[in-house]
Design a protein with these regions (language model features):
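Active-site phosphate/pyrophosphate- and oxyanion-stabilizing loops and adjacent acidic/basic residues
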Residues: 21, 100, 131
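Glycine-rich, Arg-bearing micro-motifs that act as flexible, cationic patches
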Residues: 3, 110-136, 146-149
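Solvent-exposed polar/charged
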Residues: 25, 104-105, 135
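Small/aliphatic-rich secondary-structure junction motif
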Residues: 2-55
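General small-molecule cofactor/ligand-binding pocket signal
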Residues: 33-35, 86-90, 142
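A short acidic, glycine-rich active-site loop
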Residues: 53-69
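Structural beta-alpha unit
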Residues: 1, 76-111, 148-149
Length: 149
């Protein structure tokens, strides 16, 4: 078995779960890092969030803790799909930059990311993490499309 891990992007969404399932199907038994990237907020956003959530706690820690919970859920799903998975959480803005940075750091064989299937105006306003990852990564990127009805 190849020791080079795959990187699976996971945010708890249905498209992220489909990405895990696709990775397990294409790379059975492979070592995988399941990554959730939490947004890195500005100081003003952090102060507002901290004061309303947990006084005296650094918001970045709260944000990373939440991302780690999400990544652990994804890693559990990946292990159930027979991948050798470990969770990882990072904070970054934009999200795609955090994904590309981690992929480079772990020398991922491939980045697996789900797509919400946005197009046209919606994609222009909301952005597409999968598109940006594919545009900026220096390694293969597998974009798993949404389920079509």
């Amino acid at each position: 078995m190849n020791d080079t891990p795959i990187l699976i992007c996971y945010d708890g969404s249905e498209s992220a779960r489909r990405a895990i399932d696709a990775a397990a199907s294409l790379f059975p038994g492979r070592r995988a890092v399941v990554l959730d990237v939490a947004p890195l907020l500005t100081a003003g956003e952090s102060l507002a969030a901290v004061s309303s959530v947990v006084p005296g706690t650094a918001f970045e820690d709260l944000n990373t803790d939440d991302a780690l919970r999400v990544a652990r859920d994804g890693a559990e799903h990946a292990r159930a799909a027979r991948l050798e998975a470990e969770p990882r959480a990072e904070t970054a803005s934009p999200t795609w930059e955090g994904i590309v940075t981690v992929a480079d750091e772990i020398d991922a064989a491939v980045i697996v990311v789900g797509s919400r299937g946005l197009s046209g105006v919606r994609e222009a306003f909301e952005g597409s993490v999968s598109h940006e990852v594919a545009e900026h990564a220096s390694r293969p990127v597998l974009v798993v499309p949404p389920e079509r009805s």
